[in-house]
C-alpha cells in the first residue's frame, strides 16, 4: 500500500496587506497605507504541503506545530481547504506571522510577530505511524523547533521512506542517513 507524502516542519501564517498610499504620516515622514484587501496563506512547511497537494502529489499530510490562537485556527482552515491533512503538535505561545504591507505591487514593510522558537509538544502515536507508513517525507525546516523534536527525529531515522531535508541555518542538521 502506498502511503501519503508527509511534510514535517514549521508553519507560519503569511499575510499580504494591499493598499494605496496617498499621503505621508503627519508625525513622521513615512507613507500611510490605506488597506484595500488582504490575503492569508500558509508559509514554511505549510506552503510546501499546499504546493504538493495542489500539484497532484496525491494524499499529503502535514506534521506541524500550531498554536491555540486565531493564527493557528486560520492556518488549519487554509490547509484543510487545500486538501492537506493536518497533524498538529501543540505549540506554546503565538503563531508566527509574516505580514507584508504592499502598495502598487511593492512591499513597503514586512512586520513579523509571534512565534518565537519554542519546543512543540510530543507527537501522537498516529503521527509516528504516519511517518512509518509514508511513501516519502519532506522536512521543511524554518528553524522554529519542529525539526528538533526528539520523537520526530527518531521516527525519521527509522522510516524506510525516502526523506528530503530542506534545512534552515537556525535548525538542526538532518537526521543520519538523510
What role is predicted for each listed range?
Residues 29-36:
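Divalent-cation-assisted or electrostatically stabilized phosphate/pyrophosphate-binding catalytic cores
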Residues 24-27:
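Flexible glycine/proline-rich, aromatic-decorated loop/lid segments
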Residues 1-22, 36-178:
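Ribokinase/PfkB-type carbohydrate-kinase core domain
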Amino acid at each position: 500500500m502506498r502511503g501519503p507524502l508527509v511534510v514535517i516542519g514549521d508553519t507560519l501564517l503569511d499575510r499580504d496587506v494591499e493598499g494605496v498610499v496617498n499621503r505621508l504620516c503627519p508625525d513622521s515622514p513615512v507613507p500611510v497605507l490605506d488597506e484595500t484587501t488582504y490575503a492569508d496563506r500558509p508559509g514554511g512547511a505549510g506552503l510546501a504541503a499546499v504546493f504538493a497537494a495542489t500539484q497532484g502529489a496525491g494524499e499529503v499530510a502535514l506534521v506541524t506545530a500550531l498554536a491555540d490562537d486565531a493564527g493557528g485556527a486560520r492556518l488549519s482552515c487554509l490547509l484543510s481547504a487545500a486538501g492537506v491533512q493536518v497533524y498538529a503538535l501543540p505549540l506554546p505561545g503565538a503563531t508566527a506571522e509574516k505580514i507584508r504591507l504592499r502598495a502598487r505591487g511593492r512591499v513597503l514593510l514586512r512586520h513579523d510577530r509571534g512565534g518565537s522558537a519554542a519546543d512543540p509538544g510530543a507527537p501522537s502515536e498516529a503521527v509516528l505511524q504516519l511517518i512509518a507508513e509514508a511513501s516519502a517525507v519532506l522536512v521543511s525546516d524554518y528553524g522554529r523547533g519542529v525539526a528538533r523534536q526528539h520523537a520526530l527525529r527518531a521516527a525519521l531515522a527509522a522510516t524506510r521512506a525516502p526523506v528530503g531535508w530542506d534545512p534552515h541555518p537556525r535548525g538542526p542538521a538532518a537526521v543520519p542517513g538523510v
